[in-house]
Design a protein with these regions (language model features):
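HotDog/MaoC-like acyl-thioester-processing domains
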Residues: 10-19, 25, 88-92, 100-157
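Residue-level signal for pocket-adjacent positions within structured domains
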Residues: 29, 35, 62, 69, ...
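N-terminal amphipathic/basic-hydrophobic helices that include classical n-h-c signal peptides
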Residues: 1-9
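Catalytic strand-loop segment that frames the active site of acyl-thioester-processing enzymes
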Residues: 10-59
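Hydrophobic residues in beta-strands and at strand termini
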Residues: 27-31, 83, 130
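Short loop/turn motifs enriched for small/polar and acidic residues
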Residues: 32, 77, 114
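Hydrophobic beta-strand-centered segment that forms part of the acyl-chain substrate-binding groove
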Residues: 56-102, 106-107, 121-123
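Residues that recognize and position ribonucleotide moieties
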Residues: 38-39, 47, 72-74, 119, ...
């Protein structure tokens, strides 16, 4: 089942909306990801968002090994999270992610963390830039236009 969710930014929401496939990454809250109260330590959500972003790209054929070999990058330039309900050690969750906007050289991802019983735990977003390292990973990176072929891989059918 492919869900179609759309989102947008700014005044031209209808123009900028992108109907994306929704990707799901299963995660489990482990002891080392909790604070002393036994609930999720807030940076864990950001780690899960990052893992979900890389998982999405791997699922459409842009896995980390390929991106590194082709000198491609998608650095994070902005991230936010709304904490709705605390996860507890051992909770099984899913990070549901989609792309809500493609700009010329940047894109926005929306993430939602759901506990296995469907309880929403957190919602967040990331803005990333599409780029290429000039001389390989670790060298200077420049933003690049996002290929239409890549956008098509994320588009909901």
């Amino acid at each position: 089942i492919v869900l179609i969710l759309s989102g947008a930014m700014g005044k031209n929401a209808a123009e900028n909306a992108f109907k994306s496939k929704v990707f799901s990454l299963p995660v489990q809250l482990r002891w080392g990801e909790c604070d002393p109260a036994g609930i999720i330590f807030y940076p864990t959500y950001f780690q899960w968002f990052d893992a979900a972003a890389w998982n999405m790209f791997a699922e459409v054929g842009y896995h980390a090994k390929r991106m590194r070999a082709e000198h491609l990058a998608m650095p994070l330039v902005s991230a936010d999270c709304r904490f709705l309900y605390p996860a507890q050690q051992g909770d099984h969750c899913a990070v549901r992610s989609r792309i809500t906007h493609f700009g010329g050289k940047s894109f926005v991802l929306a993430h939602e963390v759901l506990r296995e019983d469907g309880m929403p735990l957190a919602k967040g977003s990331e803005t990333r830039v599409w780029g290429r390292f000039e001389e390989g990973p670790g060298s200077r990176m420049r933003g690049q236009a996002i290929p239409e072929e890549l956008k098509a891989r994320f588009r909901a059918v």
